[in-house]
């Protein structure tokens, strides 16, 4: 299985970064502006399911 890279976005500065970048600082914070509120970015692919 290929390694999936999860991306996060800061709610203050709007920058997108990965988990290894986020682990530079202690705790869960934006590595650029040190803001605590972070959102996980959704994947750009659409998941299609058959209709019932």
Curated annotation (Swiss-Prot):
InterPro entries: RNAP_P/RPABC4, RPABC4/Spt4, Rpo12. The gene is rpo12. Belongs to the archaeal Rpo12/eukaryotic RPC10 RNA polymerase subunit family. This is DNA-directed RNA polymerase subunit Rpo12. Its EC number is 2.7.7.6. It is found in: Cytoplasm. It is an enzyme of class 2 (transferase). Binds 1 zinc ion. One of its GO terms (biological process) is DNA-templated transcription. GO terms for cellular component: cytoplasm; DNA-directed RNA polymerase complex.
């Amino acid at each position: 299985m290929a390694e999936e890279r999860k991306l996060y976005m800061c709610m203050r500065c709007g920058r997108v970064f990965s988990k290894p970048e986020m682990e530079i600082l202690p705790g869960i914070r934006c590595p650029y502006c040190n803001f605590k509120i972070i959102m996980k970015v959704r994947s750009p692919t659409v998941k299609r399911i058959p209709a019932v």
